[in-house]
Amino acid sequence: MAGVTWVIDSSSLMDIKSKTSNEVRPRLYARLTSLADEGRVRLPREVVDEMKRGAQPRHRDEALEWVLACEQQTCVTEPTVAELRAIMSEVGDVVDHRKDSGEDDADPYVLALAVKLQGQGLSVRIVTEDRKDRLRKVSLNTAAGILGVPCVPLSGFMRAEGIS
């Protein structure tokens, strides 16, 4: 999809292994890398941090390897504190406030980055597998919809970018 900037959530990156075949995966990572080089894939640093926290030390993590290899190309724009506050005032329930892990949830940062890039005139889509609303927490997909940012799962991203 020409001209679209993709802001990718850790849920989609973590699901690459389970949602793609061994045959398709190298093409997916190659396309992600070329999109990152073009400035069309963006990640907030909090997604990188979530990927690091979720890593299994005894198993190879291709998604984390890709994130770390492309970090300089993908983490070039960060939302400001004011931009994060604006997101949280609108969709604060994208975070489960009862969860006390001490670590920042990446979802508000994904949203703030997407809204910031939209404000710069870019055509932005969020890629996430987080689609299930809960009693005290809305999904990233729902929060993005409220904010007017289109959202697709990994399969939608792959289709739009012609990865098969």
What are these regions (language model features)?
Residues 3-6, 10-124, 133-134:
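Active-site-proximal, substrate-binding regions of enzyme catalytic domains
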